[in-house]
Amino acid sequence: ALRLAKERNVPVLSVVNVVGSSIARESDYTLYTYAGPEISVATTKAYSTQLICMYILSMYAAQVRGEIEESTLNSMLKEIVLLPEKVASILADKERIQWFANKFASAHDVFFIGRGLDYAICQEGSLKMKEVSYVHSEAYAAGELKHGTISLIEDGTLVIGVLTQSHLCEKT
């Protein structure tokens, strides 16, 4: 795809972790995530840093285009700086996480459901569940659950609902 874009004179911006990688070398522009070597099969670190990098790029693009004020941009950037602290808070709640893991370890199917942006999070969460725990998992758009998928939910199925957008509370 990258080479096809280059053949058609389409500028290519890559978001990569490895300096000097083949994608970086063939791209016109490169943003590096500097995540370091990936140890996990699930590539969680690479995925997370690429997502953050693209989010930051989008915020600056919005500011350049006049869609957001500089004060809004600065506020959003401050929230990103706080992410490591927020992740540390989640990890510090080890007892609660372990409780959930013990309670649901016997699930033979895990369904992640979400709407809008949360559906994308569900897709990645489902992939991580499969890659790390070897448990069958699927992601579904919350609005589609009633069209046949709901019949798959039975004893031994865990449903994880993801809702991060308050304006979708009523629909989800």
Tell what function each PLM region has.
Residues A1-T172:
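A SIS-like phosphosugar-recognition module
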